[in-house]
Curated annotation (Swiss-Prot):
Pfam families to which the protein is assigned, alphabetical: PMT
Keyword terms: Cell inner membrane, Cell membrane, Glycosyltransferase, Lipid A biosynthesis, Lipid biosynthesis, Lipid metabolism, Lipopolysaccharide biosynthesis, Membrane, Transferase, Transmembrane, Transmembrane helix
Record's protein name: Undecaprenyl phosphate-alpha-4-amino-4-deoxy-L-arabinose arabinosyl transferase 2
Native source organism of the sequence: Sodalis glossinidius (strain morsitans)
TM segment ranges: 4-24, 81-101, 110-132, 176-196, 204-224, 255-275, 288-308, 313-333, 348-368, 381-401, 409-429
Length: 550
């Protein structure tokens, strides 16, 4: 029974962090509403080859990530749990791979479970793993690729080694079909330092074609199918989504080279105290511990690769956290009390700092000129304070006996995990989580023949909630500019200066609803035709125009 306790503890972490809260969290726009709607449309249409978003061609990503979400919605229905489940499931599988690789590297089950728990409870991993985006899926395939490569290079010559390289190729192929060519580049860059240090070039050249075969065999059927259906897909996907995003000055999400340093530091909480020592030890042992050096390359090379990219988002470095968890678990097992005590102090201070920030800055009575919470949200303030008090309390608990209790740090994010969905300020909900607003005005929306929105994310929320993909865009095209450029999408977008004339004619055919997300700080809508009904909540406004009989 004693030997089962670590495994049970890991399963409890996964359940409490990644499964229990999912049903109680609204969808964020634009990301979560986007991916929810794309998969809903795939299931509704039966077309799993060409991605469509609001009925328009959407070529920003390949299809496998959507397929995972499709299966989730098919299994769990039209629910927020289903939308989030694909990400959480991918993180859980990656945690299992972390455990497996620890067994292969060090033959230590306890160390493997510790590494999996560290991975699952890292702040960045948890934040992304409960957020409906595709990054957990690509992290899963990259972890599978790195595990397959390690299995291959450790296997004796023959069919087992070949099978390992074939599995590497399959994982890379699935990664390519999830997020593109980075799934091919990142594993190559990650293993490069180890291959050079171990002088394994000959083996890679001999067995590498098997990996290439696996990748091609996995992805080629879909590659051909979408090229036949949509000949322009590969031009857009390669040039816009790869070349421009990585290299051009007008790339999306531009950030400086050092952007990922603070992201890494914050993302490793509640294990930040272990980070410097784990990296330092792996570097010092690069000559004697080939496994540790393999993990170090897996951490550092993707970080450098994405730091060189012009476009940056915190989610991009998620693949580096699996090897980082392994290195930190190994370091913690032998580092002694000092680093473990530092880790506890950092968690205590972080929790207290966040408590002070929520209670004295963000609260209605706080120091901020425009507090995040308003007067009737004291309950939410208290929930936020309680969530971070749990973090501080667990940090303090580990300080009582650092060498014995340090693993309890995995429980630091528990309060946030269980309470954050109930502590979101209303002004944030009214701008970033449109589901509640949509449900309030649902009767007006359901009787509208035409529905417009001036935000792609809000439009996606409307489509998801109403289960209709014909939501059109008003004034701003955003990420759907490419899909709207096709002739068959000409009636799916209207500019503000044309709206009055369009409205005069189309109101003869049916009611019109326009949902506007006001710019931050703007309070009036005086430049649009007067609506028959108006409803406003925060920055979201519904303008309803009734049908006019000819």
């Amino acid at each position: 029974m004693k030997s089962l306790k670590p495994g049970i503890g890991l399963m409890c972490i996964i359940a409490l962090y990644y499964l229990l809260p999912l049903s109680f969290r609204s969808l964020w726009q634009p990301d979560e509403t986007r991916y929810a709607e794309i998969s809903r449309e795939m299931l509704a249409s039966g077309d799993w080859i060409v991605p469509h978003f609001l009925g328009l061609r959407y070529f920003e990503k390949p299809s496998v990530g959507y397929w995972i979400n499709n299966l989730s919605q098919w299994a769990f229905g039209h629910t927020n749990f289903a939308v989030h489940f694909g990400s959480a499931f991918s993180i859980a599988l990656t945690a299992l791979m972390v455990y497996w690789l620890a067994l292969r590297l060090w033959q230590d089950r306890w160390l493997g479970l510790t590494a999996a728990a560290i991975y699952s409870s890292c702040l960045l991993v948890y934040s992304i793993g409960t957020y409906a985006v595709l990054d957990p899926m690509i992290a899963l395939w990259l972890a599978a690729a790195m595990c397959a490569f390690w299995q291959a290079v450790q296997a004796p010559r023959g069919w087992r080694k070949g099978l390992g390289y074939l599995a590497l190729g399959i994982a890379c192929g699935l990664g390519f079909m999830t997020k593109g060519f980075l799934a091919l580049a990142v594993p190559v860059l990650s293993v490069l330092p180890w291959v050079i240090a171990q002088k394994r070039w000959k083996e890679v050249f001999i067995y590498g074609p098997l990996a290439l075969l696996g990748a091609v065999a996995t992805s080629l059927p879909w590659v051909i199918a979408i090229a036949r259906r949509e000949p322009d897909f590969w031009h857009y996907f390669i040039w816009v989504e790869h070349v421009q995003r990585f290299a051009e000055d007008n790339a999306q999400h531009k950030a400086p080279f050092w952007y990922y340093l603070p992201v890494l530091l914050a993302g490793t909480l509640p294990w930040l105290g272990l980070l410097p020592g784990a990296l330092r030890r792996a570097w010092r042992e690069r000559q004697t511990q080939s496994g540790a050096f393999y993990l170090l390359g897996w951490v550092v090379m993707p970080l450098l690769f994405f730091s060189l990219s012009k476009g940056k988002l915190p989610t991009y470095i998620l693949p580096s956290f699996a090897p980082l968890a392994l290195l930190m678990a190994r370091y913690a097992a032998t580092c002694g009390g000092r680093a473990l005590k530092v880790n506890g102090v950092l968690n205590l201070l972080f929790g207290l700092l966040c408590v002070i920030t929520v209670a004295s800055v963000l609260a209605p009575w706080g120091l901020a000129q425009h507090p995040l919470f308003v007067q009737n949200e004291v309950r939410k303030v208290l929930l936020g304070v309680l969530g971070f008090l749990v973090w501080a309390a667990v940090g303090g608990l580990t300080l009582r006996a650092p060498t014995v209790c340090w693993r309890w740090a995995a429980l630091c994010p528990l309060g946030i995990a269980l309470l954050v969905g109930q502590a979101i300020p209303q002004q944030v909900i009214d701008a970033k989580q449109p589901q509640s607003f949509i449900q309030t005005v649902r009767p007006q929306l359901e009787k509208s023949r035409f529905i417009f929105a001036n935000s792609v994310g809000v439009a996606a929320g409307l489509a998801w909630e109403l289960q209709r993909s014909d939501i059109s865009l008003f004034e701003l095209q955003g990420e759907l500019a490419y899909g709207l450029s096709y002739p068959d999408a000409a009636d799916r977008f209207i500019r503000e200066e044309d709206f009055s004339d369009w409205l005069r004619e189309r109101c003869k055919e049916g009611s019109v609803a326009l949902v506007v997300l006001l710019p931050d700080g703007e309070t009036q809508i005086s430049h649009l035709p007067r609506a028959d009904e108006t409803y406003r909540r925060g920055r979201l406004v519904l303008l309803a125009y009734h049908q006019r009989r000819p």
